[in-house]
Amino acid sequence: MAVYTDVAAEELADFLKAYDIGELLSYKGIAEGVENSNYLLHTTSGSFFLTLYEKRVAIDDLPFFLGLMGHLATHGIVCPQPVRTRNGETLGSLAGRPAAIIDFLEGVWPRKPNVAHCAAVGAALAKLHLAGRDFSMRRANALSVWSWRPLFEQAGACADTVQPGLHDFLKAELDHLEARWPQELPGGVIHADLFPDNVLFLGDRLSGLIDFYFACHDFFAYDVAICLNAWCFEPDHAFNVTKARALLGAYHRERALSEAEQAALPLLARGAALRFLLTRLVDFLNVPAGALVKPKDPLEYVRKLRFQQRVGGVRDYGVAILGPVA
């Protein structure tokens, strides 16, 4: 979450008149993430999140995102629901941006994920994949393999200013992945951005999945690969096989990974690393002046990608081939 668009108190109070959530007491911007402008609201009825949609979020995609959150919440997934106006709308306009009010969930995201956190995330991700099967709306992954070359072309000319040799490294990896990307794997609705700051915990109990604004249809195993990269590396950049084993095992117990998915996982993890490397690089090079935002380090994903390039199979993630679930 982040803040790119400032909202005046009077303007916000007027916006909230359309909702039955009480009077505004206070609000503050949240300076995490890179996609939308987010505020925490306190009203006489409780706490809520306000999101103003910016940058890569297309207005036409918002009914999918908001509808998906509502669908998942009614199918056993702990996630925020959009708050409707008195007229039944989930989407409004504020400060020249599309805007929505979202339920507040209790919990904090884990700054130092442990093995129990990783297991909980694996199980929750599998349940999300299963719960999304009968969601009627569809959205293609706008940041899948076909989108990576345009991102590279957008940022590649400046890549070597971030790290010498980065341009050629990115080009070689992109060529490799485009030639080998899988065509047929089980798929459906995926979260596509389930990083630690998008998962809330109360102790070791998972209390919420948030930020569904990259959700789309793609391979389930690609979503798993994103989580391996996001949850299973230590601050010193070492890969933690114990965390990976916990995440994969918990996922597999809820939704069995096929042999084809397991075989593809190392390549998908390379692709997931490249995707976040490229979008972080673009964001790093294009942070708006004065924005209340902390650009994320693209070089973190260079290191993760180099690890994934050396992976020979799921055994390198700390597990044998995962068999049928009893």
Curated annotation (Swiss-Prot):
The keyword Amino-acid biosynthesis applies. CDD domains: HomoserineK_II. It comes from the Bacteria. One of its GO terms (biological process) is threonine biosynthetic process. Pathway: Amino-acid biosynthesis; L-threonine biosynthesis; L-threonine from L-aspartate: step 4/5. It catalyses: L-homoserine + ATP = O-phospho-L-homoserine + ADP + H(+). InterPro entries: Aminoglycoside_PTrfase, Homoserine_kinase_II, Kinase-like_dom_sf, Pseudomonas-type_ThrB. This is Homoserine kinase.
